[in-house]
Amino acid sequence: MLISKTPLRVSFFGGGTDFPEYFNSKKTRVIGTSINKYIYVFQNKFHSNFFNHNLRLFYRNNEFVKKVKDIKHRVFRRVLQDANINKDIEIHVSSEMPSFVGLGTSSSFTVGLINLINNFKYKSHLHSKILADKAIFLERVRLKENVGYQDQILAAYGGFNSIELSKEGYKVKKISPKFSIKKFSQKLYLVYTGIQRRAEKIEKKKISKLNVNLSYLDTISDIANEAYKCFTNSKNADFFGKLLNETWALKKKLHSQVSNDKINNIYDKAIDAGAAGGKLLGAGAGGFILFYVEDNKKNKFLRTFNDKQYIKFAFENLGSKILKI
């Protein structure tokens, strides 16, 4: 049995500018990290000649089909078609976190599945860039989904990264702050809004307003560049909360559906409880809100949100990996 273990991600700065519709004309930067929350894709063989189906897929729905073209899940169908695998395979998907909550789950699944099937078919490991490129090509070109580049890159590479994007391509740089990453990450909290939503519809609407939103996106990109300088030069992370707030204020202007009363209420509640800053993760309309809370404000913050509303996480450095059992 083969298993791909692929991290989810938290995006800090530059989100919304990682679309070629933007960076093909303006160089930009995205800052984010893979985290220690994972999606697992399991592969096993079975003898299909003894069954009335040739392929088994287990995810939110279960599929038992005779032909690859009959698979309803578009990513499964494309990846298996490209690898020319049409029988004797069973695949299970298991995620530590729900889908459609702003943690890049969909792209982490795509990266993990491509990694798994490549290892199964060719008995070889893909370089992180090749893996990210394959996932981006599949989602954006083959499936024509309205997604950016950062999710696939962070899932494939792993680590705390700056991603520079332009019409020439992208460059990934590991960020090594002068302050402790561990202590920094201990001040980060994900608060759940209780809302799951599909990012693609919101991203499509934001892309349609690109010309209207251009000045907002330019400023979001400028903030990401400022954050990169702070991460590489500052001796502490005092800047982080302020820049999160500035990014969130701009993100809400990209489309009226990015935020709503529930999200605004949670955000205001967290700021009143001592959070130095925060922003909604992902496309908008639901999912998790990231907050930065200094140690001397932690107790008040935790009294405000119970342990069913928030989750802690740590940075991870490995990206998508293959495990063999």
Model region roles, listed by residue range:
Residues 63, 98, 110-114:
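Metal-dependent C-N hydrolase catalytic cores
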Residues 103-125, 156:
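DPxDG-like acidic metal-binding loop motif
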Residues 82-101, 134:
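Glycine- and acidic-rich phosphate- and metal-coordinating loops
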